[in-house]
Amino acid sequence: VPSGIAQMTAFLDEHPDYSTAQGHYLTFTPHKGKISFYPRYIRYFDKQVTGDTPRERLLQEKNMYASLLYSVIRTQAFQRMYAACFNPDGSLRFRNLFLAEEFFNHAALIFGKYATLPYFYSARERIRGSATETTVPVSVIKTSHKYREEYQGFLLALSELLAAREGDTLEDAF
C-alpha cells in the first residue's frame, strides 16, 4: 500500500492538472478462519476523467461510482472541500456517509482531473452491520422531504466550490 500511495503522489507531481488519483482496491471478508478477497470498482480499473473544465469533468463522471473520498488528493483541494462541508456557524451541512462520498467525488473533479492507476492501493474489510449497511441511500436523501435540508446543504457546498472555481455566481453554479 505505501508504494501504491507513492505512485499516486508521483503521478500527481507529474500532472498538475489532476487533482486526485487512486489505484486498485480489494475488499476482504473474514469468515470461519478464511478470508475472501474481491476486487472493488473493477469497471474503473483504467478510468480517467479528463475534461478541461469542472463542468466537463462532472458530466464525464456522471454515474461513476468509485469513491474518490479514499483517493490521494492534493492537500489544498482537500482542505477547501472539507471546509465546504460546514456552514458559517460551524455546523455540518450534511452527515450521510453516502452523500459525503458523492460530495467528495464531485468536489474532487471540480478541482482537477482524475485517474485510476494500475497499482494496488487499498484493502478494505467488509464488515457486517457497518455503516454501509445501515446508512440511508442517496436516492432516498435526494427525494425524501425528511432529508431536504441535508440535501440542500450538499448542493450548496458543491455550488459554492463550482462558483469559486469557475468564477460564476452562486446562482449560476446552483
Q: Where are these predicted regions, by residue range?
A:
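Terminal low-complexity segments of carbohydrate-biosynthetic enzymes
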Residues: 132-174
